Amino acid sequence: MKFAGVIVDISHEQLDKIFQYIIPETMLPELEIGMKVQIPFGKTKRTGYVVDISDEPEIDISRMKSLTGICGHSVTIDGRMIKLANWIKNHYGSTMNQALKLVMPVKEKVRNIEKKTIHLLISKEEAEEYAKEAARKRYTARARLLETLAKTPVVDYSLLTQKLNINLTTAKTLENKGIIEITTHTMFRNTIKNTIKSGEKILLNEEQRYVAESIIKDMENGDMMPSLIKGVTGSGKTEVYLELIEWVINRGGDVICLIPEISLTYQTVMRFYNRFGDIVSVINSKMSKGERYDSFEMAKSGKIRIMIGPRSALFTPFNRLSLIIIDEEHESAYKSENVPRYHARETAIELAKMTGAKVVLGSATPSLESYYNAKAGRFKLYELNNRAGLAGFPTAEIVDLREELRNGNRTMFSNRLMELMKEKLSMKEQVMLFLNRRGYLGFLSCRNCGHVITCPHCAVSLTEHGNGRLVCHYCGYETPGIKICPECGSKHIGRFKAGTELVESEIKKLFPDNKVLRMDADTTRNKDGHAKILEAFENHEADILIGTQMIVKGHDFPNVTLVGVLLADVSLYSPDYMAAERTFELITQAAGRAGRGNKEGNAVIQTYSPEHYSIVHACNHDYESFYNEEIAFRELMDYPPVYNFMTVRIASEDEQKTAELSEKIKQLTDKADSRTKIIGPGKAPVYKVKDVFFRQIYYKDKEHQRLQNIKKEIDNFMKEHSEYLSKCQIQYDFR
């Protein structure tokens, strides 16, 4: 007798354990670990995932129930992915059921597309004779089919029904006589059509060749320590990736290449397809279920060897995974906003340990975590310090918006930006205007002196709430709203109010003879929205492209010679300890879009804080100086990567219960290790969503395990207090 360990398909902490069931004899030949099964659970029928098969019962067999069926339509989870799901559950704080669903980007089988083909088994002359005989006997359908096959010995079955008006019965009659053969094969849905592999290789320059050869040497020697490529914008990191991929493919390995969805453009993907042809596949959020299913089926069967996609591509079921590349590794999109709140970089490193694969990270602006790890010797560091080809660095200028206001300019466009736009457009060159509204939650800043109202305890900006009060979303500190700047006494203090539509409207008035495109969440809602706008801009169907951060992510437009960042402060003073890092990244990436061809590029950075180190160093293309200042701030405030960080989020439709439970958890964990620092509880940045209230508590510690211990303590408390368990939900976020 054998027994199955099953995780029930219910994401609840109390049910987050393995339940054992008897495997009926009839199921034994078919059942595998990773299958979805039907089970009796309590008084109902449920489904669950088999994570273990054993000979030993854990409870009395007389009390054990039997599996009732296998869900034939579900996808089987690879055993390695079950192991990874268990790591995700423990490391990021989720249920096993949530983690299992995460590692299954495709959860159900999708009907295959089948293609029938008819093959002529006799000679052309015999076919012509059979056709004449069929015509004499008035078998006109057979005659038409044989005449067609005499000219073309292999035809698609669809031709019979669409053009020749022949049914399957007629074809079957000829097949039974041994005249033709009907074959059927599965067609995979391919998201890239009509691609011809050129195999064209770009010769690497000296820097690129050194980096590629060094990483290849590491792989040859079995050195699988993660490698970080710090390469300035336009330095040709992709060429290095392609060289590494080719080396792995030639040795029988498979490759996952993660690219943030916002950068996953047709232009980017085609560079891989042109080099490697149809062994490449791509996934993204706008693909159909069928396309996603086929991509993963092709990976499992070995029909494709390279998978490109956002963080969900990490769970591609390759059999010989040898290399994981994470491009633009600094991107916040690699961190999931949903439970489990995993980070693709950390998860990739864990997956690589399980499979013996190499992880290669790349960025012009590495995340502080990755650079910190490189400095500590946990990652190998390689640098590309020069732009590939003839392109030089763009000239970046900082414009002080306080001076613009004093000089009577109350618009959102500085005089210098207007001057350069007129100059570039007159030369038929293109312009990109970037408005960073990501993370914008209503900080207050003075337009006269640039002062931003910040928390005296946490060094993050205070957020204005509907009641007019200013709140810190880290520690809960509150203060009344203000109308006059406490620094200079000016009345010009408030929230920055501008969106891409307003910018577009104003630019069209200022440049009526130039074509303008806008790229934001509204204009890219449809499946091919991104591609159409980018293709139009690349083909110079527009002179000016306005957009949010999606326009500055990895796109290469040789005719763009000016980039304007309209207000750098929006990201700089978002209520987040990573605000300066995000600002540095965005300005560097934005400025890097200019002058990528052979023409000189310019970038104009508009700000009320021209002296801030993140802006100054970004304009000077000086990552090292920025890192040194920012890591000193993190050390002073005990923020990651120096300390580990855990956010405990308490949610409930009952506002009183949310506040009450927050205080209970704070009191409970106050008794924890004295080395753990606790901040809060306070209201979440978005306090109420769909009638659910959110509060949060922050924990900081040098050791990740101590934070895990606090999580277990909170989980145990919740299990023992049903009055909270039924009305409140706890979510964890580790950094």
Where are these regions (language model features)?
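A general secondary-structure signal for short beta-strands and their flanking turns/coil
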Residues: 1-3, 16, 428, 600, ...
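AMP-binding (ANL) adenylation modules
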Residues: 40-43, 261, 637-639, 686-688
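A carboxyl-terminal module marker
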Residues: 667, 671-690
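Accessory, non-ATPase domains that flank or precede helicase/AAA+ motor cores in DNA-metabolism machines
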Residues: 1-363, 375-391, 672-675, 698-700, ...
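Short conserved micro-motifs at the rims of enzyme active sites and ligand-binding pockets
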Residues: 660, 690, 709-710
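Inter-lobe coupling/hinge segments of SF2-like helicase ATPases
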Residues: 199-205, 209, 213, 223-659, ...
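A general secondary-structure junction signal
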Residues: 52-54, 104, 184-186, 435-437, ...
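Generic structural motif
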Residues: 118, 180, 396, 462, ...
